[in-house]
Regions:
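Well-ordered beta-sheet/strand-loop patches within structured domains
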Residues: 53-54, 135, 139-173
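N-terminal helix-rich structural modules
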Residues: 1-130, 142
Length: 173
């Protein structure tokens, strides 16, 4: 489920690569989450693909800087929102938990199930709070629970953390 979300954020539908013949090109596309070589400044390595969109799929590919700057929405720089076009063609924000609702629900249920199996109260607390956070895009309480997880031998981090895919504003995770 997390992998599906990452594909959606990085490229879109990965089935175009699954349809490629078995071989190095297909394998490399699957490793790179798309046709761009992450180790070579995102240079395309599959014919027919141009430069990687700077905003990955966090923003509409045709959005201009001026259009984004003029977009008056306090959530536009929130790390847990996507920028999409409404039916009227205007920009709008969409929460991750709405865009990826089906995947988020499955992930949250897996975390809740795992919480019933752990013997560490701090881990259980983190897993339950993170499940709630994924469903609401409010990560503050679960981040505090993560910091309180001092008795675990695992450093368990689940959810949107890194923002390096966002080459436009550097905020979307």
């Amino acid at each position: 489920e997390v992998d599906h979300i990452y594909w959606q954020q990085s490229f879109g539908d990965k089935s175009v690569f699954e349809a490629l013949p078995e071989g190095p090109e297909r394998s490399y596309a699957m490793i790179n989450y798309g046709p761009w070589d992450r180790l070579d400044n995102n240079a395309p390595f599959i014919a027919g693909y141009g430069e990687r969109p700077a905003g990955a799929r966090f923003y509409p590919e045709d959005m201009t800087r001026e259009e984004f700057d003029a977009f008056d929405d306090p959530l536009k720089l929130n790390p847990y929102t996507l920028i999409r076009r409404g039916e009227d063609g205007k920009l709008k924000t969409v929460w991750y938990h709405e865009e990826y609702a089906e995947n988020i629900d499955k992930i949250a249920r897996y975390l809740e199930s795992a919480a019933t199996m752990t013997i560490k109260e701090s881990v259980r607390n983190y897993l339950l709070k993170r499940a709630d956070a994924l469903r609401t895009d409010d990560y503050y309480e679960s981040d505090l629970a993560w910091m309180d997880m001092k008795d675990s031998k695992m450093d368990l981090v689940i959810g949107p953390i890194e923002d390096y895919e966002d080459g436009i504003n550097g905020v979307k995770t």
